[in-house]
């Protein structure tokens, strides 16, 4: 959901509509990549006792006879400890894919396990749930679908009095959700959304983190925009998610990361982003951005990027919504502190996590695309030179930096006057030496704006061998029209 600024007029050979078409294609590819690069994963909770985890107690692969034996002992044993021990042995065997396949092939095995899950003995219940959890971690969808008879009970136990048991059920559901559409199809009418909405009011951090995980798995389903997200938006979950992201002493980083990704998936679906904006999503995320910038100034902890990444994406995507203006969304962020905070994060990423620079620049692009006030903040805070220092990082970063500068320049003569003179022209002459077509193309666009609004730039460009820099690209099909137009402008100027 990248909002690129509107292109400027070009020579008729490469008209505005053609440029828009190319840009739409690039944006579609970017949106697709961002949707596909999601955090689809599974999580495994194992709390083996020390004596179980020792080297001399490696879990063995179980055959049919052993699986049947452990199930029989767990179901009919005379002592509770014997029954519990049988389930522990079964659970440890289920860590192996071979045992998992053996288990689901055995007739009545899942029925027996579900029976133990619903027993009135808490320890047996817990061990049966742990067995299901091991099965849920399988990479085979057939194993997940074999667990279908247990899903309604897992949902019921989300209202249990034991926070540990609720946490286990949530992670198990999350693992099953991501593996099989059949599981999701069954869980929706069984009431998973109301069950999750009830869980979000839990006072236990571990439960909230597990809830965020299960919800994020549900939101990443291919059918989520049509079949899942509308019911989530109709529940109390969005308001509670935003509360979990409010900065302050109650903010828990682990919980915040989970719910920030949940919010990201909802926003990417574009089902009802005006609703989220109306709930104050922009102001909440903007305050969280300020909080993150303050945190990176106090700590060397690189783990902060786990939260920064989804927060930046959420803000960037929300700013592309038409509803931002109609509900006063821009006003929720109209503060130069947001720009200053973003640059603190960009410097942090530059030093510690360069792969996240595009996320921050993507937000800066969307802030400046249609907002003269944010462009003014960029200039008044003297942030052009720090921005130019990011150009050598990568071609992707270079394009985004140049796009932001184009956003500023296209606001007119007053803005170009403040961009000039300075390090901008030497930087542009340097980027014209790049071999990447998109970097050079964006450099040409910025030069075009400078020539248009700051005519004195033309003479300096000529004095610094600008024409020779242009000549190396005049045979490139994607660039030659723009190169020719700039050459003519420079010579006529």
Curated annotation (Swiss-Prot):
Gene3D superfamilies: Leucine-rich Repeat Variant (1.25.10.10)
One Gene Ontology CC term in the entry: membrane
InterPro entries according to UniProt: ARM-like, ARM-type_fold, Armadillo, Importin-a_IBB
Topology in the lipid bilayer: Multi-pass membrane protein
Transmembrane feature ranges: 338-358, 386-406
Subcellular location: Membrane
Primary localization class, coarse: membrane
Keywords for the protein's UniProt record, in alphabetical order: Coiled coil, Membrane, Transmembrane, Transmembrane helix
Identification of the protein by name: Transmembrane and coiled-coil domain-containing protein 6
